[in-house]
Amino acid sequence: MARYRSVCLVAALLGAILLGSAGCQNGAEPAHPAQITAAELAERVGTQAAPLILDVRSPREYAAGHVPAAVNVPHTELAGRLGELGIDKSDELVVYCLSGKRAAMAEQLLEKDGYTSVRDLQGQLRAWQGGGYPVE
């Protein structure tokens, strides 16, 4: 009886392991639903479908190069400047910085303030530049 329980336990554990790894067959990590890739954003920049792009880095970093059409609103000023942007809370927004830390803070602030379509640039500005997309 004890052996039967052990066999059942091992079979159950193996089944759980196999089921848990079924979604990871190709090894690719799925994109976070609140992200947009550099390629997706590049296709939309300059079109009617372009989101409002917020560069939340410092003005100095922004001046050194930014995604075309991006508006510079440093993450430390974002809360006080939301009104001047003239955007609806349902408008699509894309936020980015250099590494993702400031963009994550901005995304959290925007969502807390009721903005419903906030995404961040997957890989941030480094991914944009690494993809060979233009900077202004």
Predicted regions and their residues:
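Rhodanese-like catalytic fold shared by cysteine-dependent sulfurtransferases
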Residues: 2-52, 59-92, 98-136
